[in-house]
Amino acid sequence: MGNCAIVGINWGDEGKGRMVDLLTESYDIVIRYQGGGNAGHTVINEYGKFALHLLPSGIFRKGVVNILGNGVALDPENLWKEIEEVTAKGVPITPENLKISDRASLLLPWHRELDGLEEARLADKKYGSTKQGIAPFYSDKYQKKTIMAGELLYPEHLTEHLTDLLGWKNLTLAGVYGAEPVKVAELREWIDTYCEKIKPFICDIGAFLRKAQADGKDILFEAQLGALRDLDYGIYPYTTSSNAIASYAPVGSGLPSAKIGEVIGVVKAYSTCVGEGPFVCEMFGAEAEALREAGFEYGAKTGRPRRVGPIDIVATRYGVQVQAATNIALTKLDVLSYLDKIPVCTHYTVGSKETDEFPFPSVLDSAKPVIEYMDGWKCDISGIRKWEDLPVAAQRYVEFIEKEIGCHVGFISVGPERDSIIIR
């Protein structure tokens, strides 16, 4: 089987969780290698419907080891709440099927507070943060001002490190934002409440993965968000603060030597976007509301309405290139079944010129979409499981996307359930 990465091609919310949940039966290990609790992976299976924000989507599969790698923004409070929600539905979670890298850094309460304070300061120039503390966390990590999960196992060192960090962080909270400084006792109580609970899951992931690799175990790398939200290759500064691309997976997982054989890029059959920033193909008014309702496009974390539009071939082709995708999973094709004509953004107009190249972020604000229309199929396709049974118009839509983005579409989802999938 070999190693595989499942990544987002666009702005996130493409349906990566349902693809990981589907494919994990063929893998031994699933690793979340970046990001934090700022986005949700929706999974529907025999246990129910879940929006996973930190837990890897392989947690429902018996015999699969799930790992939170060193690249993750580890929020002990929200992780523990998520563990409780999932186990309450009958899913076993133990140190045997969930492991946390001792090199993952902790997202602390002040990271969430700073996120909210900075968004408030930016006012109408805000980035549209989910206020889960992701940007302040990664800023601190690269300043070497965080606590690593492994430090929880060495309390005598932890106390000294916390005291030093707190003095430094309060300079920002009180001095820059005028907020109340955090007290050592408050932070200690938070650690005792949440961090103590996750200690049994913390281990040397590097050693575990090196042995797994030597034993021939197959690894599935699960990304958060998508290529257009990647810190380096996305629509900066309207990005996340980590690297959501497949090439970062070995580094963020704890196994830098890992080779990725297949990269499955997940693409929604239309475009959605949460947060601020350029969104060239955005729909408005009744047309947007109809698509949003048909696809139930509301944020898994925030519940806020997603911005929607037709599939953006220019952005999707760029995402495929950045991710070096070898296969595409096209999700939510069934949502478009209500349309007589299906809009597709094939090019951009920038100034007086038409382009099929994804522009530099500063240019995107002035780019205009070139829209073409394809025939719809106007029938329920949610029960179809074979390619040849799809309406001809649906096949042509998939084949058009495949040709334009230059990558084979090997999976097509026609519903939210695990088995609502066509494999080509």
Tell what function each PLM region has.
Residues 1-424:
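Non-transmembrane, aqueous-exposed alpha-helical and coiled segments at domain scale
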